[in-house]
């Protein structure tokens, strides 16, 4: 079928046209509904995609792929309870489908059902002992620890020469963490380094380009900005800004424990609004910023609020957490003059090491080399200092170590800054039942604050160059002490 062929080569616009044409003559074909739904989802037509995928389930309730694709779409929309139900239905219909088992286990992680998730990953490994995604899924649970038998099995799987580069990277990442659990940090570091070197060949990233980007953003927003048309626009929004592995998931969990706040997890709406404006003007961000009028910024803020309205159906406030938000603080503050932002910053050395240890999917070239990670961290610190000076009354500077040392006082100040009354549920954030899509932290936020997981000292002189780079940039290492890695 031409629609399937277009879909396989990534041309979803063409696939949509073919599937629509075919559905005119075969409106009750579940396969066509699935195909069209998948391609619509890829081009961000989410509402129609979900309708079609649900329609496929209704047309063919005994068709496992219908439930699987519907579950995957729900998962991407953070509807994790519904996703788990659909994926379980798919698994009941086809227990042999490994991808369904993996997806269901990941959904259970997000829902905090960690024991069930571990059992799901283990069942995959019983059926497919060297499955890279299952091993990685277990390693990505930061509350899970491999045993010696796991380490031996991972060593054998990693040593196979017939695996794809991505499978070897997933297995290597899991193996390194298994070696850490056995106290073998020298070998673990070697494996992390090999994994990152392999990944670096496939991902983009330029330290010089990143520095130019940061400098251009700061220079652009150093200029005067138009006065807002509506000073109340965006009062629903709490932006969360941080590097990866710095505590943003924990801070969101604390805020989402408040009865007036919905935790939206990582959403891309701000980036999508800014990108759409760049396309409309034919000028990349931030080059179009000096030309934007107060009316333009008001329009962009209204578009963002319309895109995120579904997060305010039951609660008046919501969090916007995205690891690219730090580039967009100036745009966010200007288009949403009543929005508040929380800047989460953590010890730079621990942050860089945590990112280096983490296997990121997608384009995360900054984390493939410790020098690149240092550059990225330094650029983040410089730009966020600029934002704090530019918007001093609208950004809460939250030092992660302070939160760990004195949680109640820090949480009280955080809530007051956000215009929220104190609620004890925010102190007992680990009891809050909600989907957490940041898998490395999904298990940790179900527990009280941890005091025993600092790692930089364990790697000794392996991090000496990183320490030197950070010191030269004016980012000295804090006194080593236990802290949580979220």
Q: Which role does the model predict for each range below?
A:
Residues 231-334, 340:
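Phosphate-binding active sites in nucleotide-utilizing proteins
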């Amino acid at each position: 079928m031409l629609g399937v062929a277009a879909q396989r080569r990534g041309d979803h616009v063409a696939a949509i046209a073919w599937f629509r044409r075919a559905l005119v003559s075969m409106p009750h074909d579940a396969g066509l509904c699935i195909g069209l739904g998948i391609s619509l989802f890829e081009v961000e037509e989410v509402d129609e995609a979900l309708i079609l995928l649900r329609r496929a389930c209704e047309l063919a309730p005994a068709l496992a792929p219908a439930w699987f694709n519907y579950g995957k779409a729900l998962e991407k929309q953070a509807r994790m309870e519904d996703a788990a139900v659909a994926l379980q239905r798919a698994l009941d219909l086809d227990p042999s489908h490994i991808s369904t088992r993996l997806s269901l286990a990941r959904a259970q992680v997000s829902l905090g059902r960690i024991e069930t998730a571990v059992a799901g990953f283990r069942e995959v490994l019983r059926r497919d002992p060297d499955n890279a995604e299952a091993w990685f899924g277990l390693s990505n649970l930061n509350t899970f620890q491999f045993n010696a038998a796991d380490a031996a099995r991972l060593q054998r799987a990693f040593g196979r020469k017939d695996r794809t580069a991505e499978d070897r990277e997933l297995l290597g990442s899991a193996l390194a963490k298994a070696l850490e659990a056995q106290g073998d940090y020298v070998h673990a570091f070697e494996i992390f380094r090999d994994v990152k070197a392999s990944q670096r060949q496939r991902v983009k990233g330029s330290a010089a380009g990143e520095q130019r980007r940061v400098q251009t953003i700061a220079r652009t927003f150093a200029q005067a900005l138009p006065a807002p048309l509506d000073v109340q626009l965006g009062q629903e929004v709490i932006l969360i800004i941080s590097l990866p592995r710095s505590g943003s998931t924990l801070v969101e969990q604390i805020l989402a424990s408040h009865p007036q706040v919905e935790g939206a997890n990582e959403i891309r709406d701000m980036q999508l609004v800014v990108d759409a404006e760049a396309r409309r003007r034919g000028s990349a961000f931030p080059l179009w910023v000096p030309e934007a009028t107060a009316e333009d910024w008001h329009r962009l803020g209204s578009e963002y609020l319309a895109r995120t309205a579904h997060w305010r159906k039951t609660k008046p406030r919501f969090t916007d957490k995205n690891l690219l938000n730090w580039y967009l603080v100036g745009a966010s503050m200007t288009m949403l003059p009543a929005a508040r932002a929380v800047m989460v910053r953590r010890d730079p050395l621990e942050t860089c090491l945590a990112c280096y240890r983490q296997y990121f999917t997608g384009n995360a070239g900054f984390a493939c080399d410790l020098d690149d990670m240092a550059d990225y961290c330094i650029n983040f610190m410089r730009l966020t200092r600029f934002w704090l000076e530019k918007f001093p009354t609208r950004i809460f500077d939250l030092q992660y170590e302070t939160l760990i040392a004195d949680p109640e006082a820090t949480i009280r100040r955080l809530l007051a800054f956000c215009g929220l009354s104190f609620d004890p549920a925010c102190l007992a954030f680990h009891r809050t039942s909600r989907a957490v899509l940041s898998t490395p932290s999904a298990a940790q936020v179900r527990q009280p604050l941890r005091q025993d997981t600092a790692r930089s000292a364990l790697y000794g002189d392996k991090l000496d160059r990183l320490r030197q780079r950070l010191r030269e940039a004016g980012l000295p290492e804090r006194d080593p002490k236990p802290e949580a890695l979220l």
